Amino acid sequence: MLKATHIFCFGFFFAINCLFAQVGDQRSQWSLGLNGGVSLNKILFTPNIRQFYQIGPVAGLTARYTSEKYYGLICAIQIETNYWRAGWKEDIVSSNALTLPDTYQRKIDYIQVPIMASLGLGEEQRGFKGFLLSGPQLSYALRDEELRSSTWTTHEVNGEVQPNRANGVVAQYGKSIENHLDYGIVGGLGAEFTTGIGHFIVDARYYYGLSDIFHNAKKDPFAKSANNTLMLKFTYLLDFPWRKK
């Protein structure tokens, strides 16, 4: 936990430093707009649970402050407030390694706030620019929903009837999330096309959660239960105050 906190704090201070450490040609430009995309999420469980990606939406508001251009790099900080659906979807196999008709998925709805440094290379006013994103991400779970099939294969283990699963991990069933606050590090790359009517942006991101959705003490069933996410996002931004390009 201490190591995870150090990593998160490093990402936060890296993003803030990009905002205030101005040593190049200064800029002072706000850009505001909307974003939307798709999230592919798994939960990294220990012990492991076989999974497919849980596909869900991610969408919200974006604010970007461009602070300087330094040796050709366009430096900015980007903050978003998003609705994000995470969770997991199980690939269910029996203790005999047979694929079962059972289905199970968990949907977790978050308010997500990434705070990212943006380093771009390319055109500022009109044309294309490539960029890198990196920084911390905070999220808060609003609700979680459990969906399971009517077919639910069970067997007897030590006189107890429980779901038939390949490695016997069943503690997640019926267990509500215990840690609503989620934090971690997000990074990605993208491309931006700037026109006279705004910025059109596409980016791909990877999020590595440093917190767990379930408690992880020695007495708890899971030592780890962290979000692990791929995201593809589309964003439209308009400069404020607006100026004709």
Regions found by a protein language model. Give the residues of each.
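Extracellular loop and loop/strand-boundary signature of outer-membrane beta-barrel proteins
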Residues: L44-R50, L98-Q105, Q172-S176, A217-K224
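Short loop/turn motifs that connect adjacent beta-strands in outer-membrane beta-barrel proteins
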Residues: Q22-Q29, E68-C75, G122-K129, T194-H199, ...
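Outer-membrane beta-barrel transmembrane domain signature
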Residues: S118-I201, R205-A217
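Residues that define the transmembrane beta-barrel architecture of outer-membrane proteins
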Residues: S28-W30, Y53-P57, K107-V113, F128, ...
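Transmembrane beta-strands of outer-membrane beta-barrel proteins
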Residues: W30-G36, L73-I79, I111-V113, G130-L138, ...
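Short glycine/proline- and aromatic-enriched beta-strand/turn motifs that initiate or cap beta-hairpins
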Residues: A21-T62
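Outer-membrane beta-barrel translocator domains and adjoining extracellular loop/strand segments
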Residues: L44-I49, K89-N96, D144-T153, I213-K219
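Outer-membrane beta-barrel "beta-signal"
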Residues: A226-K245
